[in-house]
Amino acid sequence: MVGVNLKYGLHAPSMETVMNMIPEAYVKRGQISAKGEVKVDGTLEGNYGNKQLPAVSLNIKINDASARYEGLPYGIDNFTADFESYIDLMRRNPSFLNLKILHFEGAHTKILADAKVEDLLIDPLITLHTESTVDLDALAKTFPLQENVTIRGKLDAGLNLKCRLSSLKRQDIGRIRLGGRLALKDFELKDTAKDFNFFR
């Protein structure tokens, strides 16, 4: 068995790198002009070997980023995100995901959200807050979507959600705390390659 205590960090990734992480099944590769600061760091700590695995933490911060695909009328005017996670498969400490903030502005769209998933390896407890107005018609002209992907419509949401994943799976309404508003207009998400279609 080996004791591991490792810190890692990447300061080099750019917003362009982040944009290129969007799966090519949905978005074509293209020329991107992008700005902003991206930081990635974390730790690997614990024992490895003899059925033991170290715990892993990952932190991602994106500050004041912007991006635009060449030839498209809209772009991302401002994008900020602060995400942290901790995974301990040996369950010595609680595992979690924590999106402290996600702020997106551009293409007639404004998204402000935070979310947390606690008890990640047991029965995840999900907490989500968002205030968002989304113009999918404009977003469809922000990213070079593949021909099989269609997004359109408008969404206005101000939501607070708290529940266990098991309650969502069972559709146990009595155990799902959900409040706020959600308005959809001419809303459609479609991927013909995966035979997926959601519209309202």
List PLM regions with ranges.
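Membrane-proximal interfacial segments on either side of biological membranes
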Residues: 1-100, 109-200
